[in-house]
UniProtKB/Swiss-Prot annotation:
L-serine binds at residues 249-251, 303, 401. GO terms for molecular function: ATP binding; serine-tRNA ligase activity. ATP binds at residues 280-282, 296, 367-370. Its main location: cytoplasm. This is Serine--tRNA ligase. Gene3D superfamilies: Bira Bifunctional Protein, Domain 2, Serine-tRNA synthetase, tRNA binding domain. It comes from the Archaea. Homodimer. The tRNA molecule binds across the dimer. InterPro entries: aa-tRNA-synt_IIb, aa-tRNA-synth_II, aa-tRNA-synth_II/BPL/LPL, Ser-tRNA-ligase_type_1, Ser-tRNA-synth_1_N, SerRS_1_N_sf, SerRS_core, tRNA-bd_arm. It is found in: Cytoplasm. It comes from Picrophilus torridus (strain ATCC 700027 / DSM 9790 / JCM 10055 / NBRC 100828 / KAW 2/3). Its EC number is 6.1.1.11. Pfam families: Seryl_tRNA_N (PF02403), tRNA-synt_2b (PF00587).
Length: 444
């Protein structure tokens, strides 16, 4: 939720920010119409209360002097009816206005590219030495800005083929019991997933992040405070008969755990890494990535989250991105970082960086990390403050993926298979966690 005082004082910057996002500015018109009605109604209410106070004082004077007060009592009764009517209307306007206020997106950071479409996200940097099939070289250079790659004369096997040939997952049987986009993860691929989780937890713990496992369900109040639930609702699984949803990301319960609290200044920053399954209906992804485990209804993710003071939030944004990059550098997975353009940002984010890994079998970069600075937008919705010398202030909240395991399993399978697709090498940093150095081959 945005700051209503800032909106009133700087309406034009919000109109521009909405236009830059491709957001319908009529919602701002509706807000100001209601806000003006709220102000006018409040003015009338205060005037009537003032009149009532004056009459009440006159009644007291007349009682002391023994004068008749019946006419004044009738006036007070009439004013009470008006007050009740105006207070009811004031509450109605307040509810509607706050509902609209929740829909107005966050102000964009100055360096967010003002454009539309994922293809217009701005390249920030590239890392790694990718294996690139000859047919994909032109795309790779254009989208990485790098000439650092190894050209290969064969297309690596897709992870769909690898999990079948190496007996790493059973999607067909999962489909019998749960439908499309579910899977049984098996054998060394499952152990590799556990290794990724434990590696990421240790990695972030060493950098001062408190690891936790959040509840896997969240109530409506918390969910609507943590995210734009109207945008997210087609993605969420609702628990029938309960005020609960399965979580789509650990971000939402972590953000909500401090709702309606006032922290002490010296408690900040609070760094958290959350480990959880994520449940998503993927209603808007019909026809996309229908095979394999790249886009599924259930996956595991390690999320980074920070509560901090406003003046520190951009430093923590850089820290979150750096943490994620360092993880993928250590795994030796080639990737690029992009500054997501205004038309592709969700309502909460003032700015978002995506990290996209190179997937040589697909011949393209695909998103594996999203890092966002939500400034005070999320904290206002959840009412999370801290006590400073200048009074109570809203914290800033930031979040970033560390590892979404299924996508990284796919990245490892595509990037580290041998020429024949018979053996998948395990990244060196994961071998102490797996106890094996490859999938396939003679030692399996």
């Amino acid at each position: 939720m945005i700051d209503i005082k800032l909106l009133r004082l700087n309406s034009e910057i919000f109109y521009k920010s909405c236009r830059d996002r491709g957001f319908d500015t009529r919602i701002l018109d509706e807000f100001f119409e209601l806000d003006n009605e709220w102000k006018e109604n409040l003015k009338q209410l205060n005037n009537i209360k003032h009149d009532k106070n004056s009459i009440t004082m006159e009644i007291s004077r007349r009682i002391k002097s023994g004068d008749d007060i019946n006419d004044l009592k009738l006036k007070v009764e009439s004013l009470n009816i008006d007050i009740q009517r105006l207070e009811g209307r004031q509450n109605e306007i307040d509810v509607k206005r706050n509902e609209i206020l929740r829909l107005i997106p966050n102000l964009l950071a100055d360096d967010v590219p003002r454009c539309f479409g994922d293809e217009n996200n701005r390249l920030v940097r590239y890392y790694g030495r990718a294996r690139v099939f000859s047919d994909d070289v032109k795309y790779f250079i254009e989208n990485s800005g790098s000439g650092d790659y190894e050209e290969i004369d064969y297309r690596p096997k897709s992870h769909v083929d690898l999990i079948s040939e190496l007996n790493l997952a059973d999607i067909e049987r999962a489909g019998k019991i749960a439908g499309a986009r579910f899977y049984f993860l098996k054998n060394r691929l499952f152990k590799l997933e556990l290794a990724l989780i434990n590696y990421a937890v240790d990695f972030l713990s060493q950098r001062g992040y408190t690891v936790l496992e959040p509840p896997f369900m969240i109530n409506y109040k918390s969910m609507s405070g943590a995210t734009d639930i109207e945008t997210f609702k087609d993605t969420l699984y609702k628990i029938e008969g309960d005020d609960l949803y399965l979580i789509a990301t650990a971000e939402h319960p972590i953000a909500s755990m401090l709702q309606d609290e006032i922290l002490m200044e010296d408690e900040l920053p609070i760094r958290v890494s959350g480990v959880s399954p994520c449940f998503r209906r993927e209603a808007g992804a019909h026809g996309k990535d229908t095979k394999g485990i790249f886009r599924v209804h259930q996956f595991n993710k390690i999320e980074q989250f920070v509560f901090c003071k406003p003046e520190d939030s951009w430093d923590f944004f850089d820290e979150l991105v750096r943490n994620s990059e360092d993880i993928y550098k250590s795994l030796k997975i080639p990737y690029r970082v992009v500054n997501v353009c205004s038309g592709e940002l969700g309502n909460l984010a003032a700015k978002k960086y995506d990290i996209e890994a190179w997937f040589p079998a697909q011949g393209k970069f695909r998103e594996i990390v999203s890092a966002s600075n939500d400034t005070d937008y999320q904290a206002r919705s959840l009412n999370i403050k801290y006590r400073s010398r200048d009074g109570n202030r809203f914290v800033h909240t930031l979040n970033s993926t560390a590892i979404a395991t299924e996508r990284i399993l796919v990245a490892i399978m595509e990037n580290f298979q041998d020429r024949n697709g018979k053996v998948i090498k395990i990244p060196e940093v994961l071998i102490p966690y797996t106890g094996f150095s490859e999938i396939g081959g003679d030692d399996n």
